[in-house]
Amino acid sequence: MAALSGVRWLTRALVSAGNPGAWRGLSTSAAAHAASRSQAEDVRVEGSFPVTMLPGDGVGPELMHAVKEVFKAAAVPVEFQEHHLSEVQNMASEEKLEQVLSSMKENKVAIIGKIHTPMEYKGELASYDMRLRRKLDLFANVVHVKSLPGYMTRHNNLDLVIIREQTEGEYSSLEHESARGVIECLKIVTRAKSQRIAKFAFDYATKKGRGKVTAVHKANIMKLGDGLFLQCCEEVAELYPKIKFETMIIDNCCMQLVQNPYQFDVLVMPNLYGNIIDNLAAGLVGGAGVVPGESYSAEYAVFETGARHPFAQAVGRNIANPTAMLLSASNMLRHLNLEYHSSMIADAVKKVIKVGKVRTRDMGGYSTTTDFIKSVIGHLQTKGS
C-alpha cells in the first residue's frame, strides 16, 4: 500500500508538472518521450499509475478487455481500478455512484465506456452519466476527428476538433408538465460557463498550433440563450488576435461538414449541438468505432470514445471495433506523460488499419474484435525501440 501511495503521488506530480489544470498538458517532445520510458521503468518497480475504469454498457466491457490486453502486452505501468455502473443492468445506485466518484477523485484520471440512458422516466431526470459529469465538473468534451491512413472514406485527410460544453444547455435535466399534455424543457446558458468553454477552445487552438476557431450556435432563433453563448465567444476571441474566429449557425454547420469539412479547424459549441456534431463528424472518417474522445475539468480527465454509443446489438458477438477506445487509451497515457507507451499503442493501431488485412465489420471487413486485438499486439511486438 505504501508503494501504491507513492505511485499515486508520482502520478499527480507528473500530471501537475505536465498539465497545470487537468486539460492544460497539450504538448509533447522527444525529451518527454525519453522521460516517459525512464519513468515507466521506475514505476514498474514500485507499482503502477492508478486509473479508474468504468466499462459501461453495451460493448463497453469488450472494449475495455481490449485495452487491458494491449496494455498487458505493452507492459504499460497502469493499474485499473474497475467499477460497474449501469442503469439497464440494475447495477446503478447512489452507493455505486459515490464509489465511482470517490475513485475518480482519488485517481484524477479515468477511462470509461458508454453508460446507457433508458428513455423511460422513472422519477429521476438526470442520468447517472450526466450526474457523473456534473459532479466532476467535466465541462469540456474534446473529440479529435482525424482520418486514418489506409482507410478510405468519402472525405480523406480530415483533421478537425470539436469542443463541446457539457455541463449545462439542454442537458440541465429541467423538465416539467406545466399543463396536461404540455411539457416545458429548460435550456440553461450562463455567462461563466460560456466564457470558460470559449477560453478552453482558444487555449486548445493556441497550444495545438491551430489557426481557427468556429463558434457554432442558433442565436438567430434563441436570441438570448445562444446569443449569450455567441457574445461570450466573441469577447474571448478578442484576447486571441492570432487565432482566426468565425461563427456559424448549427444547421448550416451540419451541411458544411458534409459538403466541405476541410474548412473547419476547431469548433466550439453548446451541449446538444456538440453531441450531434460529434456523431456526424465521426461518420466522415469511419464511424463511432474509430474516433477517440476525452472530457476535462480543471482537476480531472476522463477518456472515452468520441461518439458515445453502447452498440448493444453487438454484445457478445465479438464484432466491436476497439480502435476508438485504444486510441483514447493512448491519449490517456500521453496525459499521464507516458509518451513512450502512448506512441507505441497508437502506432500499432494505426499500422493495423493502414495494412488493411484486419478490419472489423463496421470498416468493411470480416475480422473479429479478438482478431483486431491480436493484430495490434503483434505490431507492438515487432515495433522497434
Swiss-Prot record:
What the record says about activity regulation is:
The heterotetramer and the heterodimer composed of IDH3A and IDH3G subunits can be allosterically activated by citrate (CIT) or/and ADP, and the two activators can act independently or synergistically. The heterodimer composed of IDH3A and IDH3B subunits cannot be allosterically regulated and the allosteric regulation of the heterotetramer is through the IDH3G subunit and not the IDH3B subunit.
Gene designation = IDH3B
Question: What name does this protein carry?
Answer: Isocitrate dehydrogenase [NAD] subunit beta, mitochondrial
Which branch of life, at top level?
Answer: Eukaryota
- One GO BP: tricarboxylic acid cycle
Transit peptide: give start and end: 1-34
Q: Which family does it belong to?
A: Belongs to the isocitrate and isopropylmalate dehydrogenases family.
Look up the record and name the associated disease: Retinitis pigmentosa 46: A retinal dystrophy belonging to the group of pigmentary retinopathies. Retinitis pigmentosa is characterized by retinal pigment deposits visible on fundus examination and primary loss of rod photoreceptor cells followed by secondary loss of cone photoreceptors. Patients typically have night vision blindness and loss of midperipheral visual field. As their condition progresses, they lose their far peripheral visual field and eventually central vision as well.
- Its quaternary structure? Heterooligomer of subunits alpha (IDH3A), beta (IDH3B), and gamma (IDH3G) in the apparent ratio of 2:1:1. The heterodimer containing one IDH3A and one IDH3B subunit and the heterodimer containing one IDH3A and one IDH3G subunit assemble into a heterotetramer (which contains two subunits of IDH3A, one of IDH3B and one of IDH3G) and further into the heterooctamer.
Q: Which residues carry this modification: N6-acetyllysine?
A: 199
What's in the GO CC field? isocitrate dehydrogenase complex (NAD+); mitochondrial matrix; mitochondrion; nucleus
Extract one GO molecular function annotation from the record.
NAD binding
Keywords in alphabetical order, please.
Acetylation, Disease variant, Mitochondrion, Retinitis pigmentosa, Transit peptide, Tricarboxylic acid cycle
Say where the protein is mainly found.
mitochondrion
- Compartments, as annotated in UniProt: Mitochondrion
What is its biological role?
Plays a structural role to facilitate the assembly and ensure the full activity of the enzyme catalyzing the decarboxylation of isocitrate (ICT) into alpha-ketoglutarate. The heterodimer composed of the alpha (IDH3A) and beta (IDH3B) subunits and the heterodimer composed of the alpha (IDH3A) and gamma (IDH3G) subunits, have considerable basal activity but the full activity of the heterotetramer (containing two subunits of IDH3A, one of IDH3B and one of IDH3G) requires the assembly and cooperative function of both heterodimers.
